[in-house]
């Protein structure tokens, strides 16, 4: 009987996709989650909470909803075509379209790496008094070695561990503060734009919905040896990928919300402005104790390292895709993309006087590039030439294009407000 059961499980080498086995498909989404609980998010979220209290929590909710839709759509592309977003753009669009967009995506990945490396460096300064410049070099060196010497599976396990540490750290911090939960609940679903908050809103949006994550998700979703032999198998994969995305983005929503809640309950409630993350740690000590401040710094270090890993992977994927290649740690173009992203980010860090403001501006750059990536993605996933029968429906295309338009309008409003 036992042998008969084993034969059934081996038949067609096909995995069972029901029940507890669905947890095997959790993973790619969590790599994306790291990208929007990175140090740039910390800077944006603590600025939002310290300056405007609970009022900008709705931005986290809106951004996360947009993120779920966009990330599932781009993972859809990866599963159906076997191509990442960069490869698909190179294959299916003219060079005059793909090259400028992918070029700006590389710049966005550099901006991302800048924020991630800075976050790790700031955490090292908090914990061990290592200067930011040396901390940046250490973070970049460690991440480069990690990317060049580890398999995807090992990296995925490490990232899941890092996300767990970050989540537990903020859960502990929230137990120490007095949260106005009724006000928080209203703020999660009630849009409010306080005077002077537009830059912070755009920074939060750019910190949650990030262009490099769209490229990354379409790449890492292919890392599993999925069975795609027929339409039923592909549709099951799309369903379970959606569960992975929904769960992972939900984790990210909770952690981002926790940052704003913590800042609102401590800094905003005591009329304390926060100009930099180092200041946030020092201000937490008298309010919540030394242990809470140390846990804050440790979580920031985990966020910095893990998000630098994923931004490096995304840069490698984008750059390799420009040459029609998929990401692989031994591929020359993938390695060049990683080194370009981390190396240029390090050079820029040398000239930054205010690291905290640098984190805010880096998120704004991501938000400005984002519409180009979204329009590219939706154009590809709406094309029957690219996706066949799995192309977006008219309703899905309408929703996705509407998101791109909303982001574009917000960007124009931001640029206008900053210019006048």
Where in the sequence are the language-model features?
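Membrane-interface "cap" regions at the ends of multi-pass membrane proteins
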Residues: 1-40, 95-96, 200, 236-240
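Hydrophobic alpha-helical segments and their helix-loop junctions in multi-pass secondary transporters
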Residues: 163-190, 202-221, 376-385, 411-419
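Transmembrane alpha-helical segments of multi-pass small-molecule transport proteins
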Residues: 102, 127-149, 165-170, 328-347, ...
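Hydrophobic transmembrane alpha-helices that form the core helical bundles
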Residues: 76, 98-129, 136-139, 304-323, ...
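Juxtamembrane transmembrane-helix boundary signature
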Residues: 32, 59-91, 100-111
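Loop-to-transmembrane helix boundary motifs in multi-pass membrane proteins
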Residues: 95-98, 133-136, 247, 293, ...
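Flexible loop linkers connecting adjacent transmembrane helices
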Residues: 5-11, 44-49, 72-97, 122, ...
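Extracellular/periplasmic helix-exit of transmembrane alpha-helices
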Residues: 66-80, 221-225, 230, 250-279
């Amino acid at each position: 009987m036992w042998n008969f059961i084993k034969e059934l499980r081996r038949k067609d080498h096909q995995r069972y996709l029901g029940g507890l086995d669905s947890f095997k498909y959790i993973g790619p989404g969590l790599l994306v989650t790291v990208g929007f609980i990175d140090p740039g998010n910390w800077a944006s979220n603590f600025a939002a909470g310290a300056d405007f209290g609970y009022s900008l929590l709705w931005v986290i909710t809106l951004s996360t909803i947009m993120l779920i839709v966009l990330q599932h759509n781009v993972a859809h592309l990866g599963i159906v075509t076997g191509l990442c977003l960069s490869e698909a753009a190179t294959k299916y669009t003219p060079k005059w379209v793909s090259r400028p967009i992918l070029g700006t995506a590389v710049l966005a990945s550099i901006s991302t790496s800048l924020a991630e490396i800075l976050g790790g460096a700031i955490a090292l300064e908090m914990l061990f008094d290592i200067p930011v410049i040396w901390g940046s070099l250490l973070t970049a060196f460690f991440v480069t070695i990690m990317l060049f010497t580890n398999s995807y599976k090992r990296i995925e396990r490490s990232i899941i561990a890092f996300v767990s540490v970050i989540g537990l750290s903020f859960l502990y911090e929230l137990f120490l503060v007095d949260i106005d939960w009724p006000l928080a609940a209203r703020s999660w679903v009630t849009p409010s734009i306080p005077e002077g908050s537009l830059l912070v809103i755009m920074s939060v949006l750019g910190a949650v919905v990030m262009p490099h994550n769209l490229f990354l998700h379409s790449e890492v979703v292919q890392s599993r040896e999925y069975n795609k032999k027929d339409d039923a198998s592909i549709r099951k994969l799309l369903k379970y990928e959606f569960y992975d995305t929904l769960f992972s983005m939900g984790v990210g929503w909770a952690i981002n919300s926790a940052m704003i809640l913590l800042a609102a309950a401590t800094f905003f409630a005591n009329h304390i402005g926060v100009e930099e993350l180092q200041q946030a740690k020092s201000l937490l000590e008298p309010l919540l104790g030394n242990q809470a401040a140390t846990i804050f710094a440790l979580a920031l270090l985990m966020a910095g390292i893990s998000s630098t890993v994923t931004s490096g992977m995304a840069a490698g994927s984008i750059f390799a895709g420009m040459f029609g290649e998929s990401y692989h740690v031994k591929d020359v173009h993938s390695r060049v993309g990683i080194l370009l992203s981390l190396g240029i980010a390090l050079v820029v860090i040398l000239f930054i006087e205010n690291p905290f403001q640098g984190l805010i501006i880096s998120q704004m750059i991501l938000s400005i590039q984002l519409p180009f990536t979204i329009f590219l993605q939706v154009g590809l996933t709406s094309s029957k030439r690219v996706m066949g029968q799995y192309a977006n429906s008219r309703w899905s295309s309408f929703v996705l294009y509407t998101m791109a338009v909303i982001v574009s309008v917000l960007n124009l409003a931001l640029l206008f407000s900053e210019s006048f």
